[in-house]
Amino acid sequence: KELISAIQKAGGLKPMKMSLSLSEMASMIERVGKRGDAARGEKIYRRENLQCVACHAIGEVGGVIGPNMVSIGASAPLDYLIESLLEPSKKIKEGYHTNLVTLKNGDAHAGGIVSESKTELVIRDLTGKHNRIAKADVASKTISPVSLMPVGLTAQLREDEFVDLVRFMSELGKEGKYKTTTNRFARAWEVLPAGSPNPGTVHHYGAQMFTQEFSGYKWKPFYAMVGGGIPVDEVPVALKRRADEYQVLRTHVDVAKEGKHKVRLKGDSNRMDLFLDGEPIEIPADRTETDLELDCKKTGKRQLMLVLQGAKSSGQVSLEALSEDLTMLNSL
C-alpha cells in the first residue's frame, strides 16, 4: 500500500472523491474536456468489476438493468454525467427507479417494472432476471428513491481514470467513432472462460474441437466495443497446452436464404480459425482484413465460432455481415 501511495503521489494520481463542490465540479468539467481520453475511457467502462456493461446496453448489446447509453453523450451535459456516476440516486431516469414488491407470504422482490397488467406484473431484478408475479399475491408495491446503481462504484477509480470514463460517455451518440453505426457487426458474443476443461482432443482435432458440444464448457457473455471490434487482450485464454493458447468466441447469425453469403473478418488471419456450424471456413494467410464466403445450406439461426491461436496479443478482431441475407443476432 505504501508503494502504491508513493507511485500515485509521484505521478500526481489521486483516488476519486465521491462528491464535488461547485468549484470542484467546474474544474472536473474542464479536465474532462482538456485531458479526458475516450479510448482509455471505453476500456475502463468495460472493466468487469465496474459492471457497466452488465447493467447498461450501448445500442443493441449489453445489460438491460439500467438505461441504454447509446446517445447519452449527445443528450446529457457533463455535469449530469459526472453527478450520475458519483451520486446515482440523484439522477434516476424515468422508468428505472427501484420498485419494492412485497408478497403476502412475506417474500420480496426489488428491481425495475418491465410490464404490468390487471393480473400480473413482471419485475426485472439486479441480475437481469424477469420475475412474474400474480397481482393477487402482492401485499404492497413501493418506489424507492434509491437507484439500482450502487453508490461507490467509481470509488475504485483514480481521478484520471474517472476523467477518461466521463469523456468516453460524453462522446456516445455524437458524430464520430463513438456513435453506434449501421455496420452489421457481430457485437454479442460468448467466450470460454480461462481454465475451461479440456476434453483431451485438442491435439487430434485442433481448434475444431471447440465446435463440439461439451458439458464442461461454461460460456460467458462478451460484447464488442462501440466500433464493432473485439479487444483481443480482453478475451480469456480458454485453454493452454504447451506453447499453444486458445481464445474461443462464438456468435450467431440468421440466414434468410440458402446460398453463398459474404462476411468480412478483420484481424491477424494467421492466428484465426472460423467455423460455421462446426465446419471450417478457409481463411487466406497473411491478411489483416479479408472477405470470406459462407456456404449456407440451411436457413435460420446458425452458429459462427472464432478461435484465436498463439500467444495472447493486443489489437482487435471483428466480424461483419456483408450480404443482405445475413443478420448478426446481437442478443444472447
Q: Positions of the model-derived regions?
A:
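Accessory carbohydrate-binding/adhesion or oligomerization-edge regions at the termini
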Residues: 3-34, 166, 170-237, 242, ...
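C-terminal capping alpha-helices of c-type cytochrome domains
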Residues: 3-13, 27, 107-109, 113-119, ...
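Extracellular and analogous surface-interaction loops
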Residues: 241-245, 249-262, 293-299
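Beta-strand-rich ligand-recognition modules
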Residues: 274-318
